[in-house]
Curated annotation (Swiss-Prot):
Residues 38-364 form the G-alpha domain. The keyword GTP-binding applies. Guanine nucleotide-binding proteins (G proteins) are involved as modulators or transducers in various transmembrane signaling systems. One of its GO terms (molecular function) is GTPase activity. Residues 207-216 are annotated as: G3 motif. Residues 276-283 are annotated as: G4 motif. GO terms for cellular component: cytoplasm; heterotrimeric G-protein complex. This is Guanine nucleotide-binding protein alpha-8 subunit. Pfam families: G-alpha. InterPro entries: Gprotein_alpha_su, GproteinA_insert, P-loop_NTPase. It comes from Caenorhabditis elegans. A lipid is attached at C5 (S-palmitoyl cysteine).
Length: 364
C-alpha cells in the first residue's frame, strides 16, 4: 500500500509540476506581451497647417488635464503673435489680389503693426503685451472697406481661419486680464519644428504621440526614426485644394498631400503599420466648395460642384493610393477644432492602435 501511495503521489506531483511549468510559461508569455505593448507609439504626419498640432491639443484637453494657468499665459504671447502675423498676411493678400485700400491711412496702420511686430519678437515674455498704439492701428486697419470685405469672404481670399477667429474676439483678447480659453488655444498656430513628443496614458496604455514638422525638410530628416510605431495618423486639409505650399509656391497643397500620403502608405518604414486618415477642415471645405471647384487641383474630377460628391472623390483618391490591399485605411472626416466631434474620432483612433498592437503580439 505504501508503495502504491508513493507512486500515486509521484504521479500527482508530476502532473502538478507540469501544470506549474505551463502556468509559469503562460505568465512569462503574458509578461513578454505586456512588455511589447508597454508603450504604444502613434506618429502624426501630414503637410504643414493641416491640423496635426490641433489634434494633439484636443487629446490633451479631452484625455489629460488640459492647460494650466501657467501654460495659458505662455500661449497668450503666441496668440498675440498670431494676430500680428495675420494682419501682415492680410496686407500681402491685398497685393496678391490686386485690391486697393479705401482708406489712405491704412498704409500707416500696417506700418505701425509691422514696426511693433519687429520689437515684439525681440522682447522678453514679460514685456510681450499689445500696447494701445498697435491696438488702435489694428482696429482702424480692419475697418477699411477692402479689408472688411476680404474678411467676410475669407475662403475666397484664403485668409487663415485662426486670424478671422482672433480678430472677431479682438476686444476680449486685448483686455489686461486676458487668459486664453481652450478654444483660443485650439485656434492658435505654432509651427512645429523637428519632432514634438507627447506622453499620455490612454485606456490603461502608455502612449507616445509624435508630431513631425509638416514642411518637407522636417519630414525627410525624421521619418526613418519611426519604423517601430504602431500606427500612423495622416492628417490632410480638405479646404486647401486651391492653395500652394508656404515653402514652395509652385506646388498645390492638395497634390502635395496626395503625394506624401502615397509615400508614407507604401514606404518601407510603415509596411506593417496601422494607417489612419483624417480628412480635416470639413467645415471650411463646405464653404469653399460653393465658389471654387476641386478641379483647380484635381482635373480628373467630373462630378458636380457640391460637398458630398467632391468629398467622396477626394476620399477615394487617397484610399486608392494604398498598394497594400491586405491593410485597411481607417478614415475619418473631421473638424479638429470641434472638441465634441473630435472626441469620438480620437477614441476610435485609440481603439485602432490598441487592437492593431494586440493582434501583432498575439493577444487577439
Amino acid at each position: 500500500m505504501g508503495a502504491l501511495c508513493s507512486s500515486e503521489t509521484y504521479m500527482l506531483d508530476k502532473e502538478e509540476y507540469k501544470k506549474q511549468v505551463e502556468h509559469n510559461k503562460s505568465i512569462e508569455n503574458d509578461l513578454e506581451k505586456d512588455r511589447k505593448i508597454k508603450i504604444l507609439k502613434l506618429l502624426i504626419l501630414g503637410p504643414g497647417e493641416s491640423g496635426k498640432s490641433t489634434t494633439i491639443k484636443q487629446i490633451k484637453i479631452i484625455h489629460d488635464e488640459g492647460y494650466s494657468a501657467e501654460e495659458k499665459m505662455v500661449r497668450k504671447h503666441g496668440i498675440y503673435m498670431n494676430i500680428l502675423e495675420g494682419i501682415e498676411e492680410i496686407h500681402l493678400s491685398v497685393g496678391r489680389e490686386n485690391k486697393s485700400y479705401k482708406n489712405p491711412l491704412s498704409f500707416d496702420h500696417i506700418n505701425e503693426v509691422r514696426m511693433f511686430t519687429e520689437n515684439f519678437k525681440k522682447a522678453d515674455d514679460s514685456e510681450k503685451l499689445l500696447g494701445p498704439e498697435v491696438i488702435n492701428a489694428i482696429q482702424k486697419y480692419i475697418k477699411d472697406e477692402t479689408i472688411a470685405m476680404m474678411l467676410r469672404d475669407k475662403t475666397v481670399y484664403n485668409i487663415d481661419d485662426s486670424t478671422i477667429y482672433f480678430l472677431e474676439n479682438f476686444s476680449r483678447i486685448i483686455q489686461k486680464d486676458y487668459l486664453p480659453t481652450e478654444e483660443d488655444i485650439l485656434k492658435s498656430r505654432v509651427p512645429t519644428s523637428g519632432v514634438i513628443q507627447y506622453k499620455i496614458m490612454l485606456k490603461n496604455f502608455n502612449f507616445r504621440i509624435f508630431d513631425v514638422g509638416g514642411q518637407r525638410a522636417q519630414r525627410r530628416k525624421w521619418l526613418h526614426v519611426f519604423d517601430d510605431v504602431q500606427a500612423v495618423l495622416f492628417i490632410t486639409s480638405l479646404s486647401e485644394y486651391d492653395q500652394v505650399l508656404r515653402e514652395d509656391a509652385t506646388v498645390n497643397r492638395m497634390k502635395e498631400s496626395l503625394n506624401l500620403f502615397e509615400k508614407i502608405c507604401n514606404g518601407r518604414y510603415f509596411l506593417n503599420t496601422a494607417m489612419i486618415l483624417f480628412l480635416n477642415k470639413i467645415d471650411l471645405f463646405k464653404i469653399k466648395i460653393k465658389h471654387t471647384n476641386i478641379t483647380v487641383a484635381l482635373t480628373s474630377y467630373k462630378g458636380p460642384q457640391e460637398c458630398d460628391s467632391a468629398l467622396d472623390y477626394i476620399r477615394k483618391r487617397f484610399i486608392s493610393l494604398n498598394k497594400n490591399k491586405k491593410r485597411s485605411i481607417y478614415e475619418h472626416v473631421t473638424c479638429a477644432t470641434d472638441t465634441e466631434q473630435i472626441q469620438v474620432v480620437i477614441d476610435s483612433v485609440i481603439d485602432v492602435v490598441i487592437q492593431h498592437t494586440m493582434q501583432k503580439v498575439g493577444i487577439q
